């Protein structure tokens, strides 16, 4: 949408300066193979569908009432699945909202917060929105996070693990180094993709009072369309997030989303089976692309980050699109020769590989 300078006179000065986040494309064209936004290729648990239908058909009358502002049933389900106390759980309308509350609750400090120069691009957006001071820490030449860079004075630390878009994960020992180096600052580990092979820092919660772990149901639980995210931390940090949330939106999660997410957490067998299917497919996709001459960074996510020495990444993305396949291309320094490719089903991945082999490379 184009807005004229004259029309912008109604805007707050701060809003005129904002550079908003640009989400991955959600194409309106049918029959495209969508490998650009890291959505799960498999549906949610059948129990999720049953739970949503139950709300619609068996409890329809309650839709006139506000949902539980605390989403108690959901917090209890998460706490049980993670083996923690319910007081250590915070929930929100997707992990993006949870992250926004984290920035407001913890990151308005005199010193800058630290995060990688190549990471989730919502972090600089939140920083600008809230007026957070920041310092971007360059990844090393192998696109890895060097935790020694996060021992300098700061106002907090936020790290995506596995990192996005690079897909590389830190070990728990490395995360502990960051926590121990910053005992008086909040360290946030954003684990949107952790269920695809990385180690979760949730196991460290009771040992570190400065740790917040953020997760989502969008990726590994196939609920991107319902927007449910959560944070896990000691109760004194959760209290800060609740204070922010109740100063912004007391009812962030609707009844359908609560019911669906609860059902997802209660079906651990299905969850683990689908995660393993993605992991197995990812490893085969990496092998197949390597044969075609791609260099693929080591992935612990449901996507891969790949480059080809003989082909321009931007042109590859365009040629794939012409063949009905969408991948994510970032025209940014250091990564403008990489493609981020969501792991699909084996059939979808095979179509990608065959298209590259027969029609593009």
Curated annotation (Swiss-Prot):
CDD domains: AAT_like (cd00609)
Keyword Aminoacyl-tRNA synthetase: no
Coiled-coil blocks: none
Record-listed N6-(pyridoxal phosphate)lysine modification sites: 219
Superkingdom of origin organism: Bacteria
Cited SUPFAM superfamilies: PLP-dependent transferases
InterPro entries linked to this entry: Aminotransferase_I/II_large (IPR004839), HisP_aminotrans (IPR005861), HistidinolP_aminotransfase (IPR050106), PyrdxlP-dep_Trfase (IPR015424), PyrdxlP-dep_Trfase_major (IPR015421), PyrdxlP-dep_Trfase_small (IPR015422)
Pathway: Amino-acid biosynthesis; L-histidine biosynthesis; L-histidine from 5-phospho-alpha-D-ribose 1-diphosphate: step 7/9
Pfam families: Aminotran_1_2 (PF00155)
Family note: Belongs to the class-II pyridoxal-phosphate-dependent aminotransferase family. Histidinol-phosphate aminotransferase subfamily.
Protein name: Histidinol-phosphate aminotransferase
Lineage: Bacteria, Pseudomonadati, Pseudomonadota, Gammaproteobacteria, Moraxellales
């Amino acid at each position: 949408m184009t807005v004229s300078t004259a029309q912008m006179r109604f805007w707050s000065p701060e809003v005129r300066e904002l550079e908003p986040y640009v989400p991955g494309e959600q194409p309106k064209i049918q029959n495209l193979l969508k490998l650009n936004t890291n959505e799960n290729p498999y549906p949610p648990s059948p129990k999720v569908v049953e739970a949503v239908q139950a709300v619609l058909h068996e409890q329809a009358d309650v839709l006139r009432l506000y949902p539980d502002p605390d989403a108690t049933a959901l917090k209890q389900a998460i706490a049980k699945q993670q083996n923690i106390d319910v007081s250590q759980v915070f929930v929100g309308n997707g992990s993006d909202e949870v992250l926004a509350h984290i920035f407001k609750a913890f990151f308005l400090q005199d010193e800058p917060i630290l995060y990688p120069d190549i990471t989730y691009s919502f972090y600089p957006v939140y920083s600008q929105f809230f007026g957070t001071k920041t310092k971007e820490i360059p990844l090393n030449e192998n696109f890895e996070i060097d935790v020694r860079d996060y021992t300098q004075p700061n106002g907090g630390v936020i790290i995506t693990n596995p990192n996005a878009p690079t897909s590389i994960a830190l070990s728990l020992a490395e995360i502990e180094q960051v926590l121990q180096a910053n005992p008086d600052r909040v360290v946030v580990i954003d684990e949107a993709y952790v269920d695809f092979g990385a180690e979760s820092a949730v196991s460290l919660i009771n040992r570190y009072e400065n740790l917040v772990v953020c997760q989502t149901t969008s990726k590994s639980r196939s609920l991107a369309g319902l927007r449910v995210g959560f944070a896990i931390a000691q109760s004194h940090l959760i209290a800060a997030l609740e204070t922010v949330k109740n100063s912004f939106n007391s009812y962030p999660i609707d009844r359908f989303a609560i019911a669906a997410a609860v059902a997802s957490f209660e079906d651990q067998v299905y969850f683990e089976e689908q995660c393993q299917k993605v992991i197995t497919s990812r490893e085969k996709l990496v092998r197949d692309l390597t044969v075609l001459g791609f260099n693929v960074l080591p992935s612990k996510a449901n996507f891969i980050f790949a480059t080809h020495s003989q082909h321009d990444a931007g042109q590859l993305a365009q040629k794939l699109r012409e063949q009905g396949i969408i991948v994510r291309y970032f025209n940014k320094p250091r990564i403008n020769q990489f493609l981020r490719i969501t792991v699909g089903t084996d059939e979808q991945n095979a179509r990608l590989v065959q298209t590259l082999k027969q029609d593009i490379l």
